[in-house]
Structure formats: structure tokens, C-alpha cells
């Protein structure tokens, strides 16, 4: 159930709200300043939903409402960082692209979980799509795809479905176009859901550099990791 609270009494009819994706039906009812909306079927974990509707006050004045949220994941998987590959190369004999590898410590669903990584100038983000994973599975998030058809997200039983550079037949491959890892100094953090503190993370820098961080992008992630 989704609840919206206003600063004065409002009225709605049951069909006052609709959703995208349209497969989810929204039934609304009001009680004083609150509007309760039931969604059927429930959004899958991490599914992006846009809720749109209209409410009226006792004088007939209407207000348009639009809310975007993700389906709640009550069984987030527990994943930890196990390998980071930066400094992609285009070698014909041994090419490599940027990726982050995770190991699943506790099975669950990846939907709604996300990864952030930062350079000195930019913060990038990948939202995992709904996918059931088991303990000890390997997940590889590729951050510099070539954009070829063989690069496929592996959400089903076939973990050898995807091709592409650095794809693995033994783990689940996911592909992000948000941007690659910085070669020298960067930070990575992993989250169960929006608004939560990171459950794991990693900071790296050039051995020749020392002193305090000067990038606000890197500092924001490193501070969360230290909390």
C-alpha cells in the first residue's frame, strides 16, 4: 500500500490513479488528509513505477500528483566486492574492459540494489534489475561495454548467455553504460536500497599521491563508507 498525506482533507475516486507500467492496477481511497493507494499486483523488487493521479479538496479544486518509486525489496542479497578491474586496454591478444566483481554471501534478490563509483569529477550509478541469486554466486558488472549484441544481462538460469570481453560463463554478467572506472583514484560503494548506508565499498589511489582528498565527488562516497 502506498500512502500520500496532504495538508487538508481531500477526496478521490477509486480510479483516480494510474501507473506505468500499466500491468499494475492502482485503487485509491481517501480518509481526511490521507490517500491510500493499493497496487495490484505488487511491483517486483527494484521495478521502477510512476504513479499519476488527481485529488480534489472539498471545494472541488484539483491537484495533479505524480510520484516515482521502486518496488520494495524485502529480501536483498548480501554481496561483497571481490575484484576491481580498471585501466581498460584495447590489446588484441589480451583485451580487458573495466568491471567490478562481487561474490554473493547471502542469497536473495538484486532488484533495487545499486552500485556507485566516482572519479574526481563524476559520480556514476548502476541499478541492478530484479534477479534472484544464490550464495557463492559470482556477479560481474561490466562498466565499459562495446555495445555489441552478445553483451547480455544474465538474470536467468543460463549464466553462459552473455558474450563480450571479460564475460564469464561461471558468473552472472551485467552491463552498464554509466561510465568506466577511473584509472588512478576512485571509489566504489554498494547499497541495498535508496537512502541506506553502503554495505561494502572500496577506495583506491595512485601510490605516488598522498595527502587529503580534494574531489567532492570522491569525498561524498568515502565519507559514506566511513560512517
Describe the role of every protein-language-model region:
Residues 1, 63-120, 177-184, 198-208:
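A structural motif detector for short, solvent-exposed N-terminal "entry" segments of globular domains
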Residues 2-27, 113-115:
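Short, surface-exposed alpha-helix to beta-strand junction/turn motifs within ectodomains of secreted
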Residues 30-32, 36-46, 130, 135-227:
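Solvent-exposed beta-edge/loop recognition patches
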Residues 46-54:
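Contiguous beta-strand segments of beta-sheet-rich domains
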Residues 55-62:
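Short, solvent-exposed loop/turn segments at the edges of extracellular beta-sandwich modules
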Residues 122-129:
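Short alpha-helix capping/helix-loop boundary micro-motifs
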